[in-house]
């Protein structure tokens, strides 16, 4: 979809994913339904795990929750087919009728980032921003994964660790607390069957 979603035919989409066009229409009524599914795949797997993260991580250690959320989000964006996360910024996508549903799901994720971020942040950071602004900044820092993939580079476990740790440092989390979050999250990842998403190093 390098030419944009609007300029891409359903036949081209079918060829790209290796199925017949007729099979594509068996599952989707048209391009808008395909777009809706692609967008949801880039955000919904992470959103669906937010409640579990909050249940696993005590409120006093929210830096771990933020780090865990970032790692899971990185995995979602890394595993999204054909780097569909890159679609977010395309004008023909943002103007589509199905974008609103995706935007709602994405906002749930922004809210989670903002909530965990403020609970982790230093007093100075918390005083200078609100949850919505901080959530957007944190999420944008994670979405660099789509640019890395677009450039043809691999999102290695080491790179995932660095990106997730950078989110904590945006909140002015002390290095010692970052290290604790990294090691704790590495153990908690087994609860999500993501044992290989992180190597526990920064």
Question: For each of these PLM feature ranges, what is it?
Answer:
Residues 47-51, 86-89, 94-122, 129-143, ...:
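Amphipathic alpha-helical packing segments from all-alpha helical-bundle domains
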Residues 84-89, 176-180:
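Short, hydrophobic secondary-structure boundary micro-motifs
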Residues 37, 51-79, 83, 138:
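Hydrophobic alpha-helical connector segments
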Residues 40-47:
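Short, basic, alpha-helical segments at the C-terminal edge of helix-turn-helix-like DNA-binding modules
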Residues 1-37:
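Helix-turn-helix
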Residues 111-122, 127, 144-202:
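C-terminal peripheral helix-coil segments that are non-catalytic and often amphipathic
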